[in-house]
């Protein structure tokens, strides 16, 4: 049995010591395929267009500078239009060019002459950067979906700027305890119900009500803990008291916001009100360590610390480097997600799991948000559990834009 907190094979990543171009050249030299860097049997000895870099007209003939998939930039060649059988890449090339010119001209009309002349170096540079960004984001998206253990798919989108994947973020599906912290994920009791919805089940043993209705929607007020059936229970996976442990069921998109809030998360499907959406996971650290890290994060203007203060204030979840999709969920003073403490296999009340449920119906395309303070809801009284992220020393300006915006995140 693996030690508590041990990572699954392949969970650790290290930076490569050579460039992608060098790796591709080495693979071709040794006749090796490597899908993750674009070297496949299909293009090992053949040429496939990866993206278009530049454009020019010579003697009334259109030429495009082609980046060949799996080949270094040094092998790029100018090809006449009639040789290219990649209509989607051609369309993407012109879309990127148009977007760049639109940004430069700040919405002014682009003339026919401007749209057909040879590209200026700045335009070509932007198109190449955008193409490389698109490839990097696709690889990151693929990596996220390989690592996730839940049903819902993860998509990545950036139509705002040239920002690529975060360089120091590692996707995890559950808490990662820091050295010296042990998570005992083994329940001390379990139910023997034949129907957990009607019988006295795990919640009753803990002295609370069953959290869900027949439609798998949460029915208890914020501040009330959720006790789900666990690995010792005799009920099966279809038990109505196994919701959070099934993971995210919705397809979500990590997207670049246009209001200066960096990355955000939106749902790609409709989410019914009071439904479980995702867990907030990260590295579990002591409150003392959280205080130290918090001072560093304040200087960077980032907020990823979340106090586990259901019963005590001993531990904090830090999602800055290790986390899941919730790492990218932005704050709002008028959020559509609400935090609940959850206990499943680990019944240590100092270490609840943090689940986010929808407060209302959320339509496809809407950004998901939660209140980093969780004190503005009328559902939480002054003596209820404080679910707020770890306390900060510097005030961070809020950009949520809500009518009820408090002006600061803390």
UniProtKB/Swiss-Prot annotation:
Residue ranges of domain Chromo in the record: 47-105
Binding sites annotated in the UniProt record for Zn(2+) 3: 196, 229, 235, 239
Keywords: Biological rhythms, Cell cycle, Centromere, Chromatin regulator, Chromosome, Differentiation, Metal-binding, Methyltransferase, Nucleus, Phosphoprotein, Repressor, S-adenosyl-L-methionine, Transcription, Transcription regulation, Transferase, Ubl conjugation, Zinc
Binding-site list for S-adenosyl-L-methionine: 261-263, 304, 330-331
Subcellular location, principal: nucleus
Cellular localisation: Nucleus; Chromosome, Centromere
Catalysed conversion reaction: L-lysyl(9)-[histone H3] + 3 S-adenosyl-L-methionine = N(6),N(6),N(6)-trimethyl-L-lysyl(9)-[histone H3] + 3 S-adenosyl-L-homocysteine + 3 H(+)
Positions of modified residues (Phosphoserine): 381, 384, 388
Chain ranges of the Post-SET domain: 394-410
Binding site for Zn(2+) 1: 191, 193, 196, 201-202
InterPro entries membership: Chromo-like_dom_sf (IPR016197), Chromo/chromo_shadow_dom (IPR000953), Chromo_domain (IPR023780), Chromodomain_CS (IPR023779), H3-K9_MeTrfase_SUV39H1/2-like (IPR011381), H3K9_Histone-Lys_N-MTase (IPR050973), Post-SET_dom (IPR003616), Pre-SET_dom (IPR007728)
Top-level taxon: Eukaryota
Molecular function terms from GO: histone H3K9 methyltransferase activity; histone H3K9 trimethyltransferase activity; transcription cis-regulatory region binding; zinc ion binding
BP-aspect Gene Ontology terms: cell differentiation; circadian rhythm; methylation; negative regulation of DNA-templated transcription; negative regulation of gene expression, epigenetic
Domain Pre-SET: 189-247
Family matches, as Gene3D superfamilies: 2.40.50.40, SET domain
Domain SET: 250-373
Positions annotated to bind Zn(2+) 4: 333, 398, 400, 405
Sequence similarity: Belongs to the class V-like SAM-binding methyltransferase superfamily. Histone-lysine methyltransferase family. Suvar3-9 subfamily.
The protein's assembly and partners: Interacts with SMAD5. The large PER complex involved in the histone methylation is composed of at least PER2, CBX3, TRIM28, SUV39H1 and/or SUV39H2; CBX3 mediates the formation of the complex.
Free-text domain note: Although the SET domain contains the active site of enzymatic activity, both pre-SET and post-SET domains are required for methyltransferase activity. The SET domain also participates in stable binding to heterochromatin. In the pre-SET domain, Cys residues bind 3 zinc ions that are arranged in a triangular cluster; some of these Cys residues contribute to the binding of two zinc ions within the cluster.
Function: Histone methyltransferase that specifically trimethylates 'Lys-9' of histone H3 using monomethylated H3 'Lys-9' as substrate. H3 'Lys-9' trimethylation represents a specific tag for epigenetic transcriptional repression by recruiting HP1 (CBX1, CBX3 and/or CBX5) proteins to methylated histones. Mainly functions in heterochromatin regions, thereby playing a central role in the establishment of constitutive heterochromatin at pericentric and telomere regions. H3 'Lys-9' trimethylation is also required to direct DNA methylation at pericentric repeats.
Name of the protein: Histone-lysine N-methyltransferase SUV39H2
């Amino acid at each position: 049995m693996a030690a508590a907190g041990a990572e699954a094979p392949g969970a650790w990543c290290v930076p490569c010591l050579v460039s992608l171009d060098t790796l591709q050249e080495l693979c071709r030299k040794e006749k090796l395929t490597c899908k993750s860097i674009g070297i496949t049997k299909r293009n090992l000895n053949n040429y496939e267009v990866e993206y278009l870099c530049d454009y020019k007209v010579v003697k009334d003939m259109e030429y495009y500078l082609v980046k060949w998939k799996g080949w270094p930039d040094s092998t790029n060649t100018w090809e006449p239009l009639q040789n290219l059988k990649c209509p989607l890449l051609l369309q993407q090339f012109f879309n990127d060019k148009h977007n760049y010119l639109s940004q430069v001209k700040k919405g002014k009309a682009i003339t026919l002459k401007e749209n057909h002349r040879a590209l200026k170096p700045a335009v070509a540079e932007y198109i190449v950067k955008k193409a490389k960004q698109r490839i990097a984001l696709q690889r990151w998206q693929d990596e996220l979906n390989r690592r996730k253990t839940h049903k819902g798919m993860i998509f990545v989108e950036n139509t705002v700027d040239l920002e690529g994947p975060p360089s120091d973020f590692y996707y995890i599906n559950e808490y990662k305890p820091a050295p010296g912290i042990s998570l005992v994920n083994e329940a001390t009791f379990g139910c023997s119900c034949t129907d957990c919805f009607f019988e006295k089940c795990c919640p009753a043993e803990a002295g609370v009500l069953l959290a869900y209705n027949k439609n798998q929607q949460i029915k208890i007020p914020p501040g009330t803990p959720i006790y789900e059936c666990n690995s010792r229970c005799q009920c099966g996976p279809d038990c109505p008291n196994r919701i959070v442990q099934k993971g995210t069921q919705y397809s979500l998109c990590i997207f670049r916001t246009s209001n200066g809030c960096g990355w955000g998360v939106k749902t790609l499907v409709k989410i019914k009100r009071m439904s479980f959406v995702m867990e907030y996971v990260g590295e579990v650290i002591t409150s003392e360590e959280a205080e130290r890290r918090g001072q560093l994060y304040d200087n960077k203007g980032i907020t990823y610390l979340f106090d586990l203060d259901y019963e005590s204030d001993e531990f904090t979840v830090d999602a800055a480097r290790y986390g899941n999709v919730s790492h990218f969920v932005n704050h709002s003073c008028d959020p559509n997600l609400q935090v609940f403490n959850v206990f499943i296999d680990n019944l240590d009340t100092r270490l609840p799991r943090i689940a986010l449920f929808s407060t209302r119906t959320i339509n496809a395309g809407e950004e998901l948000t939660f209140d980093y303070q969780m004190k503005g809801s009328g559902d939480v009284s002054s003596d209820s559990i404080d679910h707020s992220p770890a306390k900060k020393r510097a005030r961070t300006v809020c950009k949520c834009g809500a009518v009820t915006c408090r002006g600061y995140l803390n």
